[in-house]
UniProtKB/Swiss-Prot annotation:
Active-site residues, record numbering mapped to chain: 70 (proton acceptor)
One Pfam family linked to the record: UDG
Recorded family membership: Belongs to the uracil-DNA glycosylase (UDG) superfamily. UNG family.
Name of the protein described by the UniProt record: Uracil-DNA glycosylase
Keyword set includes Hydrolase: yes
HAMAP family membership: UDG (MF_00148)
An annotated Gene Ontology molecular function: uracil DNA N-glycosylase activity
Organism: Pseudomonas fluorescens (strain Pf0-1)
Cellular localization per UniProt: Cytoplasm
Gene (name only): ung
Primary location group: cytoplasm
Keyword terms of this UniProt record: Cytoplasm, DNA damage, DNA repair, Hydrolase
Enzyme class: hydrolase
Length: 231
């Protein structure tokens, strides 16, 4: 895997991450993915969608970072944005709880889909720290190398951008706090929106209104969290 034209990567990210594609971990990760596919294993998201978070939100446009763990592992769900699913796929339980908090926090009606592309288009970097998964096998690609790549993404965006909001939901996301310059960015933490934990503090966290208040205080347009209908 090299940072050349064989990888469709948005130019600002390609430049910022160029050195990562020459690292030994990336060679090992590429080999692992090739071997998994050769063994007939189905990998999500589909290849062209793996870098969707970066391609949807150029480095200099990032305002908010939401961290996820690894992609959804059901057919047709993952498309490269954490917590989001492709059009026509029901919203998974964690996303339903995100919608419940949006309703409570900003009185935004719960949409009938789970496609969060409009957030990414407005500057919300929706990054899974592991960017691929095997079908029906959660965390199958954990510790295969993606963590080095996505740690570097977090470091780069923290360094390059002046005033970001990081939403860190759950212990895994919060373990990345050490990569973030909290002297200039707003770091919001909560339990994960999973049904197993959301009632312990995610529901009621107010992260969406707090994000927009911080953005406006720093001269940035707020995020329109209300999702457009999917046609």
């Amino acid at each position: 895997m090299t940072a050349d034209d064989r990888i469709k990567l948005e130019p600002s990210w390609k430049e910022a991450l160029r050195a990562e594609f020459d690292q030994p971990y990336m060679t090992e990760l590429r080999t692992f993915l090739q071997q998994e596919r050769a063994a007939g294993k189905e990998i999500y998201p589909p290849g062209p969608m793996i870098f969707n978070a970066l391609n949807s939100t150029p480095l200099d446009k990032v305002k908010v970072v939401i961290l996820g763990q690894d992609p959804y592992h059901g057919p047709g769900q993952a498309h490269g944005l954490c917590f989001s699913v492709q059009p026509g796929v029901p919203a998974p339980p964690s996303l339903v709880n995100i919608y419940k908090e949006l309703k409570r926090d900003l009185n935004i009606d719960i949409p009938n889909h789970g496609y969060l592309q409009s957030w990414a288009d407005q500057g919300v970097l929706m990054l899974n720290t592991t960017m691929t998964v095997e079908r029906a096998n959660a965390n199958a690609h954990k510790d295969k190398g993606w963590q080095f790549f996505t740690d570097r993404i977090i470091e780069v965006v923290s360094q390059k951008q002046p005033h970001l909001v990081f939403m860190l939901w759950g212990a895994h996301a919060q373990s990345k706090q050490k990569l973030i310059d909290a002297t200039k960015h707003l770091v919001l933490t909560s339990v994960h929106p999973s049904p197993l934990s959301a009632y312990r503090g995610f529901l009621g966290c107010g992260h969406f209104s707090r994000t927009n208040k911080f953005l406006e205080q720093n001269g940035e347009a707020p995020i329109e969290w209300r999702l457009p209908p999917v046609v």
